[in-house]
């Protein structure tokens, strides 16, 4: 399930400690991630949009629940998108979590797959929520 065999021992239960993620200090903390994943209720084969993904911790946790779950993270800051990509590479299966560099104030990026769930990690606006609901 993971590229790094050392991360296999972490299991699939959401709530990985922050030490397992590349991040700049701005990360959804592990208790919040565990509760968010319980509310999102990932099922095999489902897709998550993680908007304002930052380190990608919610998307990573989503993907780790089942090897057929996928996620797309959208992040405007290149440094945070790079951290999310590193976390995708180290903590999920290849191709399971994709990160798109995009500023959500310009709307949703083109070509996103239809989501089964959406997590807005930062910058939630009425317009963004409306755009998500319209999909």
Task: Set out the residue ranges of the language-model regions.
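Class I SAM-dependent transferase core
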Residues: 1-44, 49, 83-86
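Conserved S-adenosyl-L-methionine
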Residues: 52
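Conserved SAM-binding loop of SAM-dependent methyltransferases across substrates and taxa
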Residues: 55-67
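Short beta-strand element of Class I
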Residues: 68-72
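S-adenosyl-L-methionine
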Residues: 74-117, 126
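Redox-cofactor binding/interface segments in oxidoreductases and associated redox assembly factors
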Residues: 119-121
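A short glycine-rich, Lys/Arg-flanked "PGG" loop and its adjoining helix->strand segment in the class I
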Residues: 129-135
């Amino acid at each position: 399930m993971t590229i790094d065999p050392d991360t296999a021992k972490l299991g699939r239960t959401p709530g990985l400690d922050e030490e397992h993620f590349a991040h700049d200090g701005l990360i959804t903390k592990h208790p919040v991630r565990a509760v968010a994943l319980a509310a999102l209720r990932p099922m095999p084969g489902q897709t998550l949009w993680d908007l304002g993904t930052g380190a990608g911790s919610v998307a990573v946790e989503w993907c780790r629940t089942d090897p057929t779950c996928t996620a797309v993270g959208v992040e405007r800051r290149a440094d945070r998108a790079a951290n999310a990509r590193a976390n995708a590479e180290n903590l999920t299966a290849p191709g399971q979590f994709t990160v798109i560099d995009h500023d959500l104030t310009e709307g949703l990026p083109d070509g996103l797959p239809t989501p089964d769930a959406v997590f807005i990690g930062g910058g939630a606006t009425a317009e963004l929520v409306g755009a998500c609901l319209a999909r």
